[in-house]
Amino acid sequence: MTVKQTVEITNKLGMHARPAMKLFELMQGFDAEVLLRNDEGTEAEANSVIALLMLDSAKGRQIEVEATGPQEEEALAAVIALFNSGFDED
């Protein structure tokens, strides 16, 4: 099964190196695959910092987060919480 939720990027600088690394590190604790998709359809796997940086995700963009795997619910909730916290940057 797959779970999805859309979240808005709220931190001032969007997805840059520090938030990408935080998201990558967060995903290491879950048995789930997480895919992010921007409003133009560009996709990035959360376990790839380079892909996350290429997602073109500036402040205000909507990102769909999709999780699949044994811990998909927990992984999705953790990713959404990280986005909602502004990656602890603001």
From Swiss-Prot:
GO cellular component: cytoplasm
A single BP term in Gene Ontology: phosphoenolpyruvate-dependent sugar phosphotransferase system
Keywords attached to this entry: Cytoplasm, Phosphotransferase system
Positions of the HPr domain: 2-90
Active site: 16
PROSITE patterns in UniProt: PTS_HPR_DOM (PS51350), PTS_HPR_HIS (PS00369), PTS_HPR_SER (PS00589)
Keyword Cytoplasm: yes
Subcellular location field: Cytoplasm
Keyword presence, Cytoplasm: yes
Gene Ontology terms, MF aspect: transferase activity, transferring phosphorus-containing groups
Leader sequence segment: none
Function as written in the Swiss-Prot or TrEMBL entry: Component of the phosphoenolpyruvate-dependent nitrogen-metabolic phosphotransferase system (nitrogen-metabolic PTS), that seems to be involved in regulating nitrogen metabolism. The phosphoryl group from phosphoenolpyruvate (PEP) is transferred to the phosphoryl carrier protein NPr by enzyme I-Ntr. Phospho-NPr then transfers it to EIIA-Ntr. Could function in the transcriptional regulation of sigma-54 dependent operons in conjunction with the NPr (PtsO) and EIIA-Ntr (PtsN) proteins.
PANTHER family linked: PHOSPHOCARRIER PROTEIN HPR, PHOSPHOCARRIER PROTEIN NPR
Miscellaneous field: Enzyme I of the sugar PTS has been shown in PubMed:7876255 to phosphorylate NPr of the nitrogen-metabolic PTS, though much less efficiently than it does HPr. This process may link carbon and nitrogen assimilation.
Family classification: Belongs to the HPr family.
Protein name: Phosphocarrier protein NPr
Organism: Escherichia coli (strain K12)
